[in-house]
Each structure stands twice: as C-alpha cells, then as structure tokens.
Amino acid sequence: MGKLHSKPAAVCKRRESPEGDSFAVSAAWARKGIEEWIGRQRCPGSVSGPRQLRLAGTVGRGTRELVGDTSREALGEEDEDDFPLEVALPPEKIDSLGSGDEKRMERLSEPGQASKKQLKFEELQCDVSVEEDSRQEWTFTLYDFDNNGKVTREDITSLLHTIYEVVDSSVNHSPTSSKTLRVKLTVAPDGSQSKRSVLFNHTDLQSTRPRADTKPAEELRGWEKKQRAPLRFQGDSHLEQPDCYHHCVDENIERRNHYLDLAGIENYTSQFGPGSPSVAQKSELPPRISNPTRSRSHEPEAAHIPHRRPQGVDPGSFHLLDTPFAKASELQQRLRGTQDGSKHFVRSPKAQGKNMGMGHGARGARSKPPLVPTTHTVSPSAHLATSPALLPTLAPLGHKKHKHRAKESQASCRGLQGPLAAGGSTVMGREQVRELPAVVVYESQAGQAVQRHEHHHHHEHHHHYHHFYQP
C-alpha cells in the first residue's frame, strides 16, 4: 500500500462527479480539533507554493494508515519536506464553497458543538462528535463511488486529492501564522451491514455475496407471485396443482362440447354407414338444434296443413284406407316419408340452411315425384348413407328444378297410381315395426317411405298442379 499511495499526484486521477466538478466534502471544521491532529510544522515562507497533505486513513473497522508519518504523498513537483501544507484558519465562518458535487452527499443534522469557531458550508451539514474534548471528528456519508457497492483504492486516492483541493480553496491563508492541516479519512460500512475485513478484496467479496444470494430468492418469490396470481394456486402445495389442472381441462372440454351442441350437432357427428344412430336416437338430436332442421314435434303440424287440403279436394284418393288403424299408420308413415324420403331426391347441396316448414319446402316436396322411379334402384345402404338432418333443407331448390319435369312425368306418375294404391295394403303395423332391429326398421321404413312418398306426392302434386299451373 505504501507503494500505491506514494505515487506522484500526476498519476492519480482526479475524482469527478457526473457533472464534471470536483467532489465536495461536507465537514465542520473547528480550530481546536484541527490543532490536535496537526503535527506542528512551521515554515516562515509563504504558502503560495505546493502544499503537502499528510494522510491517515481508516479503512473498514480496522485502522490502517495509508500514508502515515513516514510515507507521504507528494502532490507537487517539489520535495515534501520543503513545502509542507500550512493552513491558517480564519476567525469567522466561511460560506464560499458551492460545488456541484454536493448532491452526492447525505445531509445530516448538525448538533451543538463545543467549539466556538468552525467552518460551515452552504447546504451540507454533518454530525460532529466530541471525544475527550481534545479531538473532533467529522463524519460525512458518501454514496457508492462506482454505484456498484465496491470501493477501490483509486477511488479513495482521488477522493483524498479532492478533499485537499476543496479545503485548500475554501480556507483563507494568512501569511502571519502557518498551521499544518492533517486530514483523516475513514471508510466504514453502515451499521446495518455485517462486518467487513480491512482488505478491499474481502470487502468486494462480502458485498457481492449477499446480492448473489438474495437476488435468485427474490426472483423466485416474484415468479411464484406471478404464478399464483392468474392460476390461483394456494401456497406451494404441489399436490393441488395437478388436480386443478385436470379440473380445468375437463371443464374446458365440457364447455367445448356444449358450444358444439349449440352450433349444430350434425356438423360434428357423422350419420353415415351402419354405425349411424337409430331413428329413436335421431329423433332426440334435433330438439337441440335451433334453426337449421326442425324437430319432429313441429313437423306434423306443418305437414298436416297440406295434407288436409287434398283430403277435401280429392276424397276418393283415400278409398283404400278407410279404417282408423290404416289411416293412422298411413299418416305416420307419410310424415316419416316426407322427411326420410325427400333425401333421395336431393342432388345439389346449394340450398342448405333453409327451413322445411316454409311454403317453398312444401312446394319442393310436391314437385319431386319425377325422380321416384330412380329411387327403386338405390340400395338400403345408400338410404342409410344420406343424412336426414341436411336433406330437408335442400328442398327449396327442387321445385325450381323440377317445374319443367312435372308436366312431362305427370302421365307416368298417374300410371303408377294403381300399383301404388294396390301396394298400400302392405303397410306394416306398429307392433311389427317395433320388433325389428334399428337398422332393419330404418331400411323397411325407407322402403315404405318410397312407396308412400310416391303415392302421397302424386296427389299433392295433382292438387298443386291444378292450383298453380292452370292458366
């Protein structure tokens, strides 16, 4: 350390603040305290030449003389014994120091001092503690030199040079009396921190270890808080987290299925092939659907309205079905035929999303008999492969397509009236239908729906033709 602190002043850099000014030292100067510290060295010459600053530094809690009485730091080009520092303290207070570096010091309250005369700065106040009425210490608290909690030897050296310059410029030098000013710098940690060793290497290690230990802990706590806030995990219980996670997943799946049901179940459940649901299951699905397909509970009311008109117009068409059981089975099969049988005539998927209960749907159902003979060649598996939920919505396009075919195929439909009326007695009873399996029931209903569909739509078409096509 003696080698370091015996460097010339030109090697040591002057400590500057971010503003570029010199570092101001806040201290209250008293004549009695300084006289106790000063080694009496008097020189009859003037004090205009280079001055010598004798330094005794206390680093940490152990005292270590940086310069001492033997090793002195030369601040000028001349020999240190020829031109010692002589400071003449003025009898009055001096308020001539106003430095830009005063912001870097903490302002401390100044209690009453036993000394009568002291040097007081403009804005800075420091504590003055009197010990044994013979010594006086000035305590000034500094911020971190490098703003990183580390104090280096170069910082202390430059700080001592700054103290020397500030004191030299702030005191009036009297040519009559010469006194030597001895500055004692003590660098000590705060009382709240742990004890540090005298060496700066140990100080650096101890100052960096608490930060390295506490920083990951604080980051971990902050991360736990961030995790607890959105997910609402309680404490650090790792057993509750998987349960909550699985519960959220199940809830999301249920919510998704609910929205899929609201959007329309026919878009997500395929009704193709032999694995399709039965007629009883299909009758349960449409009540969930809001608009695209009407449920069976609403279809008989809409279907009875056109059915009653041909009964009043053509009462002779139902002469083979006079018994109440036959009429009931005929109406039941006819209603199912209007829904299931209409799917055999759909060839274009352009008119989806329209309702069956509208008048266009009724007209489309009436104008479809020309394609009836082609449905006899379709296999029952092809009947199963058509979706009843989508096909009734395609009806409105049919009556526009088949208007021109209605007149051409009217004779063929009338030719089929006799065999279809004769085959009307082959309607199965309700008991026989219930005994069959689901797929067989669907096939038999599809076959009966074709026959009843032809017969039913023939008469409706006849009624429709007389009312709408006659000029």
UniProtKB/Swiss-Prot annotation:
Residues 131-166 form the EF-hand domain. The keyword Ribonucleoprotein does not apply. Keywords: Calcium, Cell membrane, Cytoplasm, Developmental protein, Differentiation, Lipoprotein, Membrane, Metal-binding, Myristate, Spermatogenesis, Wnt signaling pathway. Induction: Expression is induced by activation of the Wnt signaling pathway. Highly expressed in lung. Also expressed in brain, heart, kidney, liver, skin, stomach and testis. Within the testis expression is found in the seminiferous epithelium and round and elongating spermatids. Residues 453-471 have a biased composition (Basic residues). Ca(2+) binds at residues 144, 146, 148, 150, 155. Its main location: membrane. Residues 125-190 are annotated as: Interaction with DVL1, DVL2 and DVL3. The keyword Ribonucleoprotein does not apply. GO terms for molecular function: calcium ion binding; PDZ domain binding. Disulfide bonds: none annotated. It comes from the Eukaryota. It is found in: Cell membrane; Cytoplasm. Changing residue 144 to V: Impairs inhibition of the Wnt signaling pathway. Residues 62-75 have a biased composition (Basic and acidic residues). A lipid is attached at residue 2 (N-myristoyl glycine). Gene3D superfamilies: EF-hand. GO terms for cellular component: cytoplasm; plasma membrane; protein phosphatase type 2A complex. Residues 1-23, 41-82, 273-314, 337-382, 448-471 are annotated as: Disordered. One of its GO terms (biological process) is negative regulation of canonical Wnt signaling pathway. Cell autonomous antagonist of the canonical Wnt signaling pathway. May activate a second Wnt signaling pathway that controls planar cell polarity. Required for spermatogenesis. Interacts with DVL1, DVL2, DVL3 and PPP2R3A. Belongs to the NKD family. This is Protein naked cuticle homolog 1. The lineage of its organism: Eukaryota, Metazoa, Chordata, Craniata, Vertebrata. The gene is Nkd1.
